[in-house]
Amino acid sequence: MAENQYYGTGRRKSSAARVFIKPGTGNIVINKRSLEVYFGRPTARMVVNQPLELVEMTDKLDLFITVSGGGISGQAGAIRHGITRALMQFDETLRPALRAAGYVTRDARCVERKKVGLRKARKKPQFSKR
């Protein structure tokens, strides 16, 4: 690939994304597919573009992304996190704006495990008094 590319790893729920950015024309490739093909939902596409729109670099950078694990929402969040980290590596002066928007922080929320004796993580079997 290019000699002047920047890298960022993003994670969300059970998804992990590797993001490579380099100066270009705004081309986004996710797992060898375009953004529109990979994410059918407009909300997922919006989440992916959020950090680029914030720093006004939607048409100045090319992105090459590989993402695995989880579902659509988790993958979109992981890509957003990865893009944010790669942008900070690209230009450290972008950090305060990205931090203020809340994109730098890793969202630590994940699925709570199912407990023994319960139906789900917190749902208990029906209680009978008599």
UniProtKB/Swiss-Prot annotation:
Keywords assigned by UniProt, alphabetized: Ribonucleoprotein, Ribosomal protein
Database matches in Pfam families: Ribosomal_S9
Gene3D superfamilies per record: 3.30.230.10
A GO BP annotation: translation
Keyword ATP-binding found: no
Cellular component, GO, one term: cytosolic small ribosomal subunit
Family matches, as SUPFAM superfamilies: Ribosomal protein S5 domain 2-like
InterPro entries per the UniProt record, alphabetical: Ribosomal_Su5_D2-typ_SF (IPR020568), Ribosomal_uS9 (IPR000754), Ribosomal_uS9_bac/plastid (IPR023035), Ribosomal_uS9_CS (IPR020574), Ribsml_uS5_D2-typ_fold_subgr (IPR014721)
GO molecular function: RNA binding; structural constituent of ribosome
rRNA-binding found in the keyword field: no
PANTHER family: RIBOSOMAL PROTEIN S9, SMALL RIBOSOMAL SUBUNIT PROTEIN US9M
Family: Belongs to the universal ribosomal protein uS9 family.
Protein name: Small ribosomal subunit protein uS9
Organism: Aliivibrio salmonicida (strain LFI1238) (Vibrio salmonicida (strain LFI1238))
Primary gene name: rpsI
